[in-house]
Regions:
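Short, Gly/Ser/Thr-enriched beta-strand-loop segments that form substrate-interacting elements
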Residues: 225-246
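Small-residue-rich helix-loop
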Residues: 132, 214-223, 234
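Mid-domain, small-residue-enriched loop/turn segments at the edges of structured enzyme/sensor domains
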Residues: 17, 113-197, 205
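Beta-lactamase-like hydrolase cores
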Residues: 1-43
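Flexible glycine/proline-enriched surface loops and loop-helix/loop-strand junctions
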Residues: 36-37, 95-99, 106-111, 143, ...
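Conserved catalytic neighborhood of penicillin-recognizing serine enzymes
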Residues: 78-115, 121
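Active-site SXXK
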Residues: 31, 43-71, 193
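Acidic helix-start/capping segments at beta-turn-to-alpha-helix junctions
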Residues: 67-82, 119-120, 143-149, 217
Length: 246
């Protein structure tokens, strides 16, 4: 597909929505880009998990931990939303690599919150976001906090929230967090996410082995109804999706 075709597709989608469409596309062979609102912040939902994975691999390859280190699953870290660990019994002894794999391939929120707490918010900010100069990127919350803030859960589960809202999903689209105008949030800009992905492709996040390790996990992503969905069979895609609703 030619660059001009990609530009037309982006324009078509942008014309079909009243919301800004954020796009950052780069041909890594030629350096040619297609950009739309690429420097503006957007809420990431689960797409922010790639920055958590980046800090985990930095920490492991710095010798501060091993991906084979085991930590038990606890009830305290369980998060609502996507994944399977929330439904499993506490005490399950998982490696850091297990948590990372679940976080990335099925977007497990509990695995994410374990790693977010294990690594530390400030370390993710300092060692990844600030280090790469990602001025529009924030990874301030684990998944449980993100869901609580965006949806106003206040201790309720999704069924209670649904019933309290008259059988409808609550709207957060006009919230200040969704508009990315708050001091704390989980957000990124398309061009900044593209920068992270290009570093992985070129083997320049930590080193080639670490970059390839991250990509190998991302190639196993099971939410394949989006980016890979309309691509020809056999195309290998390393990616991470994110959704605030369905």
């Amino acid at each position: 597909m030619r660059i001009e075709q990609i530009k037309q597709i982006v324009k078509q989608y942008q014309n079909g929505t009243s919301a800004p469409l954020g796009v950052a596309f780069k041909d890594l062979k030629t350096g040619t880009t297609v950009l739309a609102h690429a420097d503006e912040p957007f809420p990431t939902a689960s797409a922010y998990k790639i920055y958590i994975l980046a800090e985990l691999y930095r920490k492991a390859y710095a010798g501060e931990c091993s991906l084979n280190d085991r930590y038990p699953l606890t009830d305290a870290v369980k998060s609502i939303g996507s994944g399977v660990l929330e439904q499993l019994d506490a005490g399950l002894n998982l490696t850091l690599n297990d948590y990372a794999t679940l976080m990335m391939i099925i977007s497990d929120n509990t695995a994410t919150d374990f790693l977010f707490n294990f690594l530390g918010r400030e370390n993710i900010k300092h060692n990844v976001i600030d280090y790469l100069g990602l001025s529009q990127t924030k990874c301030d919350w684990g998944c449980n906090k993100l869901i609580d803030v965006y949806y106003g859960m206040n201790g309720r589960n999704f069924q209670q929230l649904w019933e309290d809202n008259g059988g409808r999903s609550p709207s957060y689209h006009n919230s200040k967090w969704y508009q990315c105008i708050t001091d704390e949030n989980n957000q990124t800009a398309p061009c900044e996410a593209m920068k992270m992905l290009e570093l992985l492709y070129r083997g320049k996040w930590v080193n080639r082995e670490a970059s390839e390790g991250m990509l190998n996990i991302m190639k196993q992503c099971q939410t394949n109804s989006r980016i890979p969905h309309l691509l020809p069979p056999g195309i290998v895609v390393a990616h991470k999706t994110g959704s605030l609703d369905k």
